[in-house]
C-alpha cells in the first residue's frame, strides 16, 4: 500500500506479512499521517512493515509485531515531530530494528512487551534533536542486542517499566548532551555476562535513579566461568559535567571463588560487577538512596576453572 498526500489515515486491522528485501507493507508520503496497526505483522528478509515519510506523523501499534533479519524494520518514521506509540508486543531478532524514528522532536512511547535478541538487533532506534522516550512496558534484551538506541541532544528519557539485560547486551544506549534521564524502573536487572543496563555518553546530562537496579550475573550459565572477570555494569556515564543522583535502590551481587594454582600464589578470585560507573571531568554524583553490596561464595560449579583464565603466574 502506497499513499501520497497530507493528513492520510490508515487503519490496518488485518495480517501484514513482508518478506521481500526492500519491500514495504504500508508507505505514506506526506505530513500529518496516522497509521494504526492493530493486527499481526511479520517482517523479514530486509523488508519494512510501515514507513511514513513526512512531518507530524503518528504510528499506533497495538498488535503483535515480529521483525527478523538484517535491514528489516517494523515501523519507520522519517520526519520531524514523529510519534510512535507501542501498546502491543514487539519481537526483534537477527539484526533487525523494531522501530526507527528519525527526525527532530520525535517521540516513542512503549506500554507493551519488547523482546530483542541477536547481534545488531535494536528494539527502538531514535535519532534527532529533542527526542522523548517513555517506557512503562516490559523489555527483555539478550545475545548482543540493544533495547533502546537513542541519539539526541536536550532529550528526555523516562524508564518506568521493567527491563532484563542478558549476555553482551545493552538495555539503553544514549548518546548526546543536555539530556534528562529518569530511571524509575520497578526492576532493571542486569543478569548477563558483559552486559550493561544503561549507557549514557555525552556532556551535561542529568541522570536520576529512583527505581530498583540489580546487577547479578548468572553464575549458572554455561559461559559464567569464561566471563567471570569481564564486568557487567548497571549504569555507565561517560563525559563531562554530568549529574547523577541515586534516590532509589542499587544492588550489586558479586561472587568470590576459593581457588588454587600450582604456584599457590592465589587463593581466591572475585567476580567483576559494577553498579554505577562515572568517568569524565566535572561530574557530580549524589548518593541519597540505598546502595547494597551482596557477596556470594562458590556460586560457580568449578571455581578452580576461574583462576586459570585471566590471572597470571608470577
Give the label of every model feature segment.
Residues 1-314:
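Long, low-complexity, polar and repeat-rich extracellular regions
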Amino acid at each position: 500500500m502506497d499513499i501520497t498526500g497530507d493528513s492520510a489515515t490508515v487503519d490496518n486491522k488485518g495480517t501484514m506479512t513482508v518478506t521481500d528485501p526492500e519491500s514495504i507493507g504500508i508507505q505514506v508520503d506526506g505530513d500529518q499521517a496516522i497509521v494504526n496497526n492493530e493486527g499481526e505483522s511479520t517482517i523479514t528478509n530486509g523488508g519494512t512493515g510501515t514507513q511514513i515519510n513526512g512531518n507530524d506523523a503518528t504510528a499506533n501499534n497495538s498488535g503483535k509485531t515480529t521483525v527478523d533479519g538484517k535491514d528489516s524494520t517494523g515501523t519507520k518514521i522519517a520526519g520531524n515531530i514523529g510519534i510512535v506509540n507501542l501498546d502491543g508486543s514487539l519481537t526483534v531478532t537477527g539484526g533487525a530494528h523494531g522501530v526507527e524514528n528519525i527526525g527532530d522532536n520525535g517521540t516513542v512511547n512503549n506500554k507493551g512487551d519488547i523482546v530483542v535478541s541477536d547481534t545488531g538487533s535494536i528494539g527502538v532506534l531514535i535519532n534527532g534533536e529533542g527526542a522523548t522516550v517513555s517506557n512503562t512496558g516490559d523489555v527483555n534484551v539478550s545475545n548482543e542486542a540493544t533495547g533502546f538506541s537513542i541519539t539526541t541532544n536536550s532529550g528526555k528519557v523516562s524508564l518506568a517499566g521493567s527491563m532484563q539485560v542478558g549476555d553482551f547486551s545493552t538495555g539503553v544506549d544514549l548518546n548526546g548532551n543536555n539530556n534528562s534521564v529518569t530511571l524509575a524502573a520497578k526492576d532493571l536487572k542486569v543478569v548477563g555476562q558483559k552486559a550493561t543496563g544503561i549507557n549514557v555518553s555525552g556532556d551535561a546530562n542529568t541522570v536520576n535513579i529512583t527505581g530498583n537496579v540489580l546487577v547479578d550475573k548468572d553464575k549458572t550459565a554455561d559461559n559464567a566461568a569464561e566471563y567471570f572477570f569481564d564486568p557487567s555494569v548497571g549504569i555507565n556515564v561517560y563525559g563531562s559535567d554530568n549529574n547523577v543522583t541515586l534516590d532509589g535502590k542499587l544492588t550489586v551481587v558479586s561472587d568470590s571463588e576459593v581457588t588454587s594454582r600450582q604456584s599457590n600464589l592465589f587463593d581466591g578470585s572475585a567476580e567483576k560487577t559494577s553498579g554505577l560507573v562515572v568517568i569524565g571531568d566535572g561530574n557530580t554524583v549524589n548518593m541519597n538512596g540505598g546502595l547494597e553490596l551482596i557477596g556470594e561464595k562458590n556460586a560457580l560449579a568449578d571455581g578452580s576453572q576461574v583462576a586459570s583464565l585471566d590471572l597470571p603466574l608470577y
